[in-house]
Amino acid sequence: MTVSPRLQNLVSWDSDWAGLRVAVTGIGVSGFAAADTLIELGARVVVVDAATSDTARAQADTLKIVGAVDVLLGEEAVNRIPKIDGGFPELIVTSPGWRPDQALLAAAARAHIPVWGDVELAWRLRVRAGHKTADWLTITGTNGKTTTVGLTASMLQAAGLKAIAVGNVGTPILDALRDPVEYDAFAVELSSFQLHWAESLSPVASVCLNVAEDHVDWHGSYNSYLADKAKVYARTQKACIFNAEQIETERMVEDADVIEGCRAVGVTTLTPAISMLGVVEGLLVDRAFIEERKDSAAELASMSDLGQFAPRHMVANALAAAALVRAYGVDAKAVRQGIQDYVPGNHRIQPVAKQNGVLWVNDSKATNPHAAAASLATFENVIWIAGGLSKGVSYDHLVRDNAARLKAVVLIGTDTAALADALQRHAPDVPVITTPAGDTENMQTAATGGAITGSSPDSGAAVMSRAVASAAQLAASGDTVLMAPAAASMDQFSSYAHRGDAFIDAVRELVEGQAQTGEE
């Protein structure tokens, strides 16, 4: 696609954005931030979204007040390219969840209208006269992104730097750019969706933590998904960090077009080779960013610094974060302090309760088989609550590799056929209970051009309450009830957090009831 000279020259906050006709697709968190920013820059902005909820209408009213040309809501609004001041947009800025084959975006491709994501827009706005320009450390991967981003920001802060975690989850990067705080560095979480719409990022250091089959429905194929993940390494300045235990990420680095002088640095949960970070006798060590790396290693932290649970994937995340900040010049002491200061987010292998010898664990963030495998590997004698929207993935490897640790399975969700079939093939002796879906509706996702709408909180809570009750009947002292769904949540919940909160509420209600009745 030929890009107009005007768009090519939009490389800073101080470039000529005034009067630029821009359509923003999506009125959610990232779409709202993009529209608000572009309006501030003087662009002529029209926003479209399929949603017609009260929240969407309130967002629309706000954008109109601050200067949007128009905000168009409803299904018709997202099926065609909107006109702006009588002409087509010169640029479309899309929210990450919108698929390339969505009607409006497909029409834009046919009309040769450039499409950026919010991250691409943020990169082009990062330089601003009279303001500090924050450096970017970028993180992607099928799993572990949010944890690694949080650890990276914590380590940077422990080194005395002004840093913040931004991107796919948490603070929208455009909001961070406009924050009165002048940051030294951003720890940027990038989804495959965001990378798909990014073309010019050049981070100081970058990492793809891991890859596994995920979002095939969005990308069209696993190879397309890998290609978008690999874009995290493009134009990296100092260090491309890869998972030395997964050849796909190393190949991404080998194929990346990087800035001259950029290094390839591996991370492993095993003993590290030269130019790697890894683990030696319970210590996290660095053999990459030290002078005498040929025959020595720098101690960064101990396994105990990672807390009560230090599953293998958590160790890998900490090592990846350490590699990023070490590439940025952070010392070993700050790495340890950052790990100790880090508070893990909810819904990530989160112990909820222990009653009558049964441990209840919430890992609602495990939205695909790869994440669920890491969670299952942490425990034995598991009653597994799983299911949801499968996103077109296979469950055969997950079930086959973990069948021996499964005591029983409680299925939730409206799209459980693939998981149920895998259980029948590879764990035929494991009892499986299917929780009725009840009156829940399918949630509408941004892939169709809309903000999430649909199912009521009460219906999701009822499903989870039934699942928890079923698990309680199966569990005995020494067992773990693990909610690690291996699927997306939008069939019965508004988000993985909503699903996790429903699990927590149901478990606490169960435990309180057992305590009051003296049930053993």
Per-region residue spans from a language model:
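N-terminal leader/targeting and accessory segments in enzymes
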Residues: 1-121, 513
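Nucleotide phosphate-binding/pyrophosphate-handling subdomain across enzymes
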Residues: 6-7, 13-21, 33-41, 301-406, ...
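Phosphate-binding loop of NTP-binding sites
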Residues: 13, 39-40, 79-89, 96-263, ...
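Residue-level signal for inorganic ion chemistry
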Residues: 38, 92, 139, 168, ...
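Short internal beta-strands
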Residues: 43-52, 241-244, 385-386, 405-415
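Short beta-strand "acidic-cap" motif of Rossmann-like dinucleotide-binding folds
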Residues: 44-49, 164-165, 187, 266, ...
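Beta-strand->loop->alpha-helix junctions that form or flank phosphate-binding loops
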Residues: 49, 72-75, 116-121, 166, ...
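C-terminal helical cap/extension that packs against the catalytic core
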Residues: 59-61, 66-69, 399-479, 518-520
